[in-house]
């Protein structure tokens, strides 16, 4: 048998064994918690149209902005190998300053305060 066939056989066998074990283990000592589906802390039998706080959305948008900032600043150490490393540093400082000013503005406007 060649290497790929061996790897595929081991993968399928291991997957089947783990799937079988995961179905048998909860049935050994059944419990209401073990037999109920878990939906990220929400009741799966309740209404799906519950009111959703706008603060969650705001925090998610802020997280995405700062995640994007990190993605933009990650290649910065390789920027000193360009023809003009000073220009790269100026642009990255400008992006960082703009996002910092936006965070300060959001903070002073009370957007980060969690109000009920």
From Swiss-Prot:
Location of this chain's protein in the cell: Mitochondrion membrane
Catalytic activity: a ubiquinone + NADH + 5 H(+)(in) = a ubiquinol + NAD(+) + 4 H(+)(out)
Main localisation: mitochondrion
TM helices/strands, residue ranges: 3-23, 56-76, 87-107
InterPro entries: NADH_UbQ/plastoQ_OxRdtase_su3, NDAH_ubi_oxred_su3_sf
Molecular function terms from GO: NADH dehydrogenase (ubiquinone) activity
Record's GO cellular component terms: mitochondrial membrane; NADH dehydrogenase complex
Annotated keywords: Electron transport, Membrane, Mitochondrion, NAD, Respiratory chain, Translocase, Transmembrane, Transmembrane helix, Transport, Ubiquinone
Assigned protein family: Belongs to the complex I subunit 3 family.
Full protein name: NADH-ubiquinone oxidoreductase chain 3
């Amino acid at each position: 048998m060649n290497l790929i066939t061996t790897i595929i056989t081991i993968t399928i066998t291991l997957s089947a064994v783990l799937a079988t074990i995961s179905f048998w283990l909860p049935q050994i000592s059944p419990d209401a918690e073990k037999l109920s589906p878990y939906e990220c802390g929400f009741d799966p039998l309740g209404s799906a149209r519950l009111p959703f706080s706008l603060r969650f959305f705001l925090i998610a948008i802020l997280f995405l902005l700062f995640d994007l900032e990190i993605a933009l600043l990650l290649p910065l150490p390789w920027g000193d190998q360009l023809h003009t490393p000073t220009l790269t540093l100026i642009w990255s400082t400008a992006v960082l300053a703009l996002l910092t000013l936006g965070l300060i503005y959001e903070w002073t406007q009370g957007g980060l305060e969690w109000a009920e």
